[in-house]
Amino acid sequence: MLAIALLRICGVVLFILALTLAGVGWVARGPLVLRASSFTGRPSSSTWPSISVQNLRATVKTLCEDLSPRSYHPPSNLARVADWIAGRLRETGLVVMEQDYRTSEGTYRNVIALRQGTDRQRGVTVIGAHYDTCGPFPGADDNASGVAVLLELVRTLPKPPPRSSQFFVAFGTEEDPFFGSQDMGSAHFARKLSDDGTRVELMIALDLVGFFSDEPGSQSFPYGFLQLYYPGRGDFIAVVGDLGAGRWIRRVKRGMLAAKALPVYSFRGPSLIPGIDWSDHFSFRQLGLPGVLVTDTAFLRNAHYHQPTDTPGTLDYSRMAAVVQALHGVLAEEGT
């Protein structure tokens, strides 16, 4: 037993050493860990007058209060939420579709808005956020924030159609007991795209995008050495992916930084690091499709994660508006 324990300890030490060396090497070449934010300072909603802080706040409040609970049992909980999201998306004038799927726990639904591109030969971009919660918790940051950003992004899309088609998806089941299984809502949607022969150019999962802090030391890290590369304040948004996601991380980060909305940092690492694949991009990566996560880093910053204190009053809606603006920057690059 002692020998096994020592082997495990040695393995962890070697992994951290390898990751450290990889991080130092990659800083010179590209973003494994990269201090590459060209924007500093607190965002102001006046920078993008069409994006409404009030809408973001109202959406989170509705999801956390009027439509609570958003837990998977019984399925009628999430059916009410899906109906409401579908109604909001239809108000934008986009084509709205609903994908019902069966699981061992019941039938659930993905809600999909399609912004049709002018060039049908090009691949599609997918931006999605799950609308269920972990147990009975309010789930303001996880993940009413992601749904609110998704809906506000769709509401403020420019009128001219893009060259590449874009899907905006509210996923029905992401939390336990579905997480990591074939019954995640995103897994059902990814398989449908794959079965239809639809080429996915990029998938972005929005998960926990509303908690920010200017307090020193408010940002923590899975490994201490990462403090060498990242700020100690939780005032930035992160683009995260696995070791094979480097080119997609760079594309998303480039578009977000071009919007000059808020600081953007990126991280690329092995999936055994906690949080790397903890969202709907996981389903796409399982099929070999592009997928990255846009996040406030969840439990590494937000002490309310998966707690009853994850309430609307803890979120920063001005910075959520900045995330919407940053995503417009990504779509501008992807759609051209």
Predicted feature descriptions by range:
Residues 8-26:
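Hydrophobic membrane-insertion alpha-helices, especially the h-region
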Residues 23-77, 132, 300-310:
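N-terminal capping segment at the start of a domain
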Residues 40-51, 67-76, 97-101, 133-143, ...:
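Second-shell loop/turn segments in exported
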Residues 53-66, 88, 92, 104-171:
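Catalytic-core environment of secreted peptidases
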Residues 55-58, 62, 76, 80-84, ...:
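Extracytoplasmic/secreted proteins, especially bacterial periplasmic and envelope-associated proteins
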Residues 202, 214-336:
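Active-site-adjacent substrate-binding region
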